[in-house]
């Protein structure tokens, strides 16, 4: 049986708004297709990957930022956006791998919780390939990937009519001081970390991209088709 195919779109370092715009176009594209179980080998959607070009704080469906906090964060020079993903406030910025799979879960044989667990598994596997064997996901209601009490990967998704958007943010060489201005994901008493901090060397988004794609293909049991144009 042929594996479902997923379009791979690598945007490089781009403004966060550009990622959201492309995500919306893929959402409309999938929503316009017939909502039926697809035969084997059918395309299941797109995997959008990028590194944010500038600092952005985002709030999810559960909120997380008051108007006063929003004004304070903007005064720091960061963009602030309210998104449709699950979860509370977090930070995105240079040195971070953003992965937004826009997928019809029916074509992958997945339910939403399995999709979230699969994203966590991709991040755990990447950490293992980088030499961090203690990376773990936590049981619900927690999401993301941790090294002890330090969060290295945040996850927040949205799903409507079986179609997902948003995804994960994994800290490679992120300036972690940006997280000091919020309570990341609403979790008091926990810290954040990055691959660079844990490995004591500079780890770029470009470096981790190939092993991440290997992990994604293995865990989602799909093939990846490179997309020359993001449109």
UniProtKB/Swiss-Prot annotation:
Top-tier EC class: transferase
Bilayer-spanning residue ranges: none
EC number: 2.3.1.181
Limits of the BPL/LPL catalytic domain: 41-224
Site (described: Lowers pKa of active site Cys): 151
Similarity comment text for this entry: Belongs to the LipB family.
Additional notes on this entry: In the reaction, the free carboxyl group of octanoic acid is attached via an amide linkage to the epsilon-amino group of a specific lysine residue of lipoyl domains of lipoate-dependent enzymes.
Disease: Encephalopathy, neonatal severe, with lactic acidosis and brain abnormalities: An autosomal recessive disorder characterized by severe encephalopathy with neonatal onset, metabolic features including lactic acidosis, little or no psychomotor development, and brain abnormalities including cerebral atrophy, cysts, and white matter abnormalities.
Record-given protein name: Octanoyl-[acyl-carrier-protein]:protein N-octanoyltransferase LIPT2, mitochondrial
